[in-house]
C-alpha cells in the first residue's frame, strides 16, 4: 500500500535540503526517505522528481510516496465475531477511532490472542481490503470502555504518538467512584479542577496491581532517584499527574471527569483509590463489602470508567479533531436514575 504525503514549505524552512524538511517537518525516518527516492516519482518538488539534496524555497510543494514495508502489513488474526460489533466513531485514510466496549482487551496478550479489539480492527481492515498494520495509539484496560484511536500507517502513528507524549492529544474520562466529596468544599465544586500528583509503582504482592505513594503529599513529583528514604525506593517510582472535576456527589458515590498528563498503568484507578474514592466495580483496587452496605451505590459488574472524549490534530492536515464516545448502557442507566446528564 502506498501513501502520498503533500507538504508546502514554510518560510522558515527556506534554504534547507529536501531531506532535512522531510525529516524535521514530516518526521520521516532516513529509511523511509531512502526507500522513496529510489522509486519513480517517489519524491517530487513542484511536480518534478527531485533529489534529497535539492534546496527548497518558500511555498515549494513537496510530495513523497511512503510505501508500506513488509512489517507494516497486517499480521494479526482477524476476528469478526458478533459478540462485540465494531463501533466506528471516525475514519479516514490515516486514522480510525472506535468505541471499545468493556470486557475485551485492546491488544493481544497472554491467552487472548484472537479475541481483542485489535483483532476486530484487523478483521475490519481485511474486509475492506486495506493492507495495513494495526497500531493502537494508547490502550484501555480490559474493563474500561470508550475511545481507542488507531493509526493506519507508520507516519500517522509516529505523529499521533508524539502528540500523545507532548499533551496535544488528550482524552477525557468519566468515572463513578465510591464515597462523597461533599466534606471537601474545594473538591465538591462542580466547576473546579483538582490535581493529584502521587507517584506510582508496582506492588510487591500482586503481579497486576499498582500503588500510589502518598508519603510526600499530592504535589510531589519525583525528578530523580537521588533522593533516598528508608520507606520508599525512589528508583521504582513513576511520576503520574491526574486532573479531576467532581460532577455529582451523593453520600455514597460520586461522578467525576478526569484528564491525564501521564499515561501510567491503572493511573486513574490508583489515584482515585489514594484519595479514598476507588472506582465502583474495581475488584482489583476495592475491597469487597457486604451487600447491604452498597445499597445506595449503583451496581457495576466492571470498573466504572469510560474514555469519553478525545481531541488531537490530524497527523497530516493539522486540523483539530474532537470525538466523543456515547456512554455505555451501565452509565446511562446510572445517570437516568438520578436525572443526571453531562
Spans of model-derived segments:
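RNA pseudouridine synthases
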Residues: 1-342
